[in-house]
Amino acid sequence: MSFVTAAPEMLATAAQNVANIGTSLSAANATAAASTTSVLAAGADEVSQAIARLFSDYATHYQSLNAQAAAFHHSFVQTLNAAGGAYSSAEAANASAQALEQNLLAVINAPAQALFGRPLIGNGANGTAASPNGGDGGILYGNGGNGFSQTTAGVAGGAGGSAGLIGNGGNGGAGGAGAAGGAGGAGGWLLGNGGAGGPGGPTDVPAGTGGAGGAGGDAPLIGWGGNGGPGGFAAFGNGGAGGNGGASGSLFGVGGAGGVGGSSEDVGGTGGAGGAGRGLFLGLGGDGGAGGTSNNNGGDGGAGGTAGGRLFSLGGDGGNGGAGTAIGSNAGDGGAGGDSSALIGYAQGGSGGLGGFGESTGGDGGLGGAGAVLIGTGVGGFGGLGGGSNGTGGAGGAGGTGATLIGLGAGGGGGIGGFAVNVGNGVGGLGGQGGQGAALIGLGAGGAGGAGGATVVGLGGNGGDGGDGGGLFSIGVGGDGGNAGNGAMPANGGNGGNAGVIANGSFAPSFVGFGGNGGNGVNGGTGGSGGILFGANGANGPS
């Protein structure tokens, strides 16, 4: 019943009020009893006598019922008084127990506070104007204190305090005008999440830059990395960069997300990078933060966090590029996906972020991250889609490389080029190239090239080339080339990938393999070459 509250003093007051009501009613009933229970007959006739007896009997019954009501009223008052007393006793007992607990903690914490400057058990104090950094949590248990959020221009926010053995790191404080946010505190050595970075301070100074977001705190063993703080807004200059996400615990956890770049009049801030996913068996990188929007040039997205689990790893996705909103503006590029690695099992690189929309030029899609594994499946991340535009669409990002020593290496697909909507002068973005798939023993498959960006009336984007795939003792499969983007003016299809891999700057063909098909276009892409001993070349794309 933790949701029930009681105020003993209010119960005592209510009991007294109810008792006073009962006293008043008893006095009134006693006054009325004499005149109502003995009613004189109006005359000597039988009818008058009967009426008098009726009223007298009614009054007598009323007095009997009133006596029962008075007894119930008295019992109710006693119950209220008893309940108030019980609650008062319970509060006194609880207060005594709490005092005992506080006294016990004080005895336990005093030596540790004197020796190490922090308690054994308890949360760290929040930062203040005089001491902006949050205090560290208890050595055994407790969260770090939050950093102080500054109100003075140019002064950075306070850092969050670190946790002890178990607990979460404190959040960083917000920076003053134009100043950086405070870093998040580290999580507990055994268990706990890192604190979030503080927001960067905004600025309205001409040509000024918003404050950078604070970095998220790391999680040492088990826990999530803290998210990076957002960059500060700039009314007349450049937005602040987003803070980087904190790393996950080395045993288990997820890297923190990068902070969003600050928006601005001139150039949007770059998004923060995602935190590393460094779990022993499972590694999950944090996503990069989005770039800030701007009237002129949007900010680039932050890179996804790397991942390094021993059995399973996923790199974080890159952040999306910020939009450019005014006429003649350019958008930010998407951030690259995080690389991923594993010993035995599965590793996949993060996808590249989407390019932002720009009035003049769309942002390019981010590169897909690499996925590499010793034995198992390594998959490259997908390239990000190019950003749309009223002028020229952004290029799709290239797919990441997928590699393995023994198993399957699959390259990521290239991103689709950005669309262009300006009637008559629009140019679709180029499709991204497919990633290379490499395997020493097994199967290497290149990623498909991205399709070119479409346009309403103008030049469509060329399709991206397919990635090469293969290896020394593996079957190689080249990725298909991307199709040309739709448009009134001609565009070319991408070439198919070859059966083989590029190593040390030179192409090494596979003994067995199949080339990828060329993409469709006014000039169809050329099919990729097959294996030198067995296989087939890819078909040329139709024109």
Swiss-Prot record:
Residues 1-93 form the PE domain. Disulfide bonds: none annotated. Coiled coil: none annotated. InterPro entries: PE-PGRS_N, PGRS_rpt. Residues 194-214 are annotated as: Disordered. Belongs to the mycobacterial PE family. PGRS subfamily. This is Uncharacterized PE-PGRS family protein PE_PGRS44. The gene is PE_PGRS44.
